[in-house]
Amino acid sequence: MQIQKSFKGQSPYGKLYLVATPIGNLDDMTFRAIQTLKEVDWIAAEDTRNTGLLLKHFDISTKQISFHEHNAKEKIPDLIGFLKAGQSIAQVSDAGLPSISDPGHDLVKAAIEEEIAVVTVPGASAGISALIASGLAPQPHIFYGFLPRKSGQQKQFFDSKKDYPETQIFYESPHRVADTLENMLEDYGDRSVVLVRELTKIYEEYQRGKISELLESIAETPLKGECLLIVEGASQNVEEKDEEDLFSEIQVRIQQGMKKNQAIKEVAKHYQWNKSQLYAAYHDWEEND
């Protein structure tokens, strides 16, 4: 059991501040963040060049220490040493909150183990900022950060998450979004998704629609800039039906004058099946019937 009194405690140690930085718009930097960065003894920065530009903009002269995922293991003992000597440290990532898809978690754990106060200086967070403007249910939600890059691993990931009812938040590179949506469509079915691009910047854009609609849009206009995907959770109200029942519903629509492809598309959408998989299954059923 441990109780931390962030500001009223009597610890001789310095404090570890986790300071949020802008995710694209410098006007989102808070007064408290600027003041904290000016007052601490050290700034542990993911990229000292990027952070250097931020510090210059706000006239901050505090010394920096490089701290990122590739040197964290060797740097953490040094940083803990500074903190135990009574010096304060602000940890920043290139954008947003430290530890959220960025280095910092291991440093936080090490500080807590040494009973060093860890203090959040809140601010911009891309995932939550995109979620609240997405139009999808803001809670419950699950933030996953960056997806596996390899297609096979990504498909396994989506297969394990397809039945989750929570809204899901992902970061993705613009040149991988199309492949990611294809993999998602295969496992999730054609559910609602929001693609958020260049959040807080001049070219900020939201594309809202079904996964298949976004794929068509991306094919026509390739993406640029940093991207997030906000995906609708699995519906808990959709009646489960086996293939035979779905085939019957498709036939009813066809008999009512609907074209086969449109009938399959509507049934797949209603029951949250993957359209391509249902089409292939229906085609095989037709041939063998």
PLM features per residue range, with description:
Residues 2-5, 13, 167, 174-289:
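A contiguous loop/helix-start segment that scaffolds small-molecule binding in enzyme catalytic cores
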Residues 37-43, 115-119, 167-168:
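Short active-site oxyanion
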Residues 1-67:
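Glycine-rich, flexible N-terminal cofactor/catalytic loop recognition
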